[in-house]
Regions:
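Acidic/His- and Gly-rich active-site-bordering loop/insert found
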Residues: 2-102
Length: 102
């Protein structure tokens, strides 16, 4: 990130504070318990919420046999994009599955 990119990114993040809080409140409403690890619906719900925030979202479903081989019923990876300038790319890795309640 270049010094000229920082103000644009900061302005974006500050301006999105309420949307971020609403996003997180909505996100935790979508079940993603693992087991059973059926996270495709959660990923789609997440993608829709992120698109509403102005991000470009690519959906990459993992083949069912590969998901099952890793103990998951379904997995969809999301790639998000938001351009702030000509600076370097910022990458973040996260997961949406959670342990069952209780």
């Amino acid at each position: 990130m270049t010094p000229t990119d920082r103000p644009a990114m900061r302005a974006f993040l500050v301006g999105m504070h309420d949307a971020e809080a609403n996003f997180l409140a909505e996100l935790v409403r979508a079940p993603s318990d693992n087991p059973p690890g059926d996270c495709a619906a959660h990923a789609e719900h997440t993608a829709i919420l992120l698109e509403r925030m102005g991000l470009t979202v690519e959906r990459h479903p993992v083949p069912a046999e590969l998901a099952r081989a890793h103990g998951m019923a379904s997995v969809t990876n999301l790639v998000l994009r938001r351009r702030f300038g000509d600076g370097p790319v910022f990458a973040m890795k996260a997961h949406g599955d959670v342990v069952p309640p209780g």
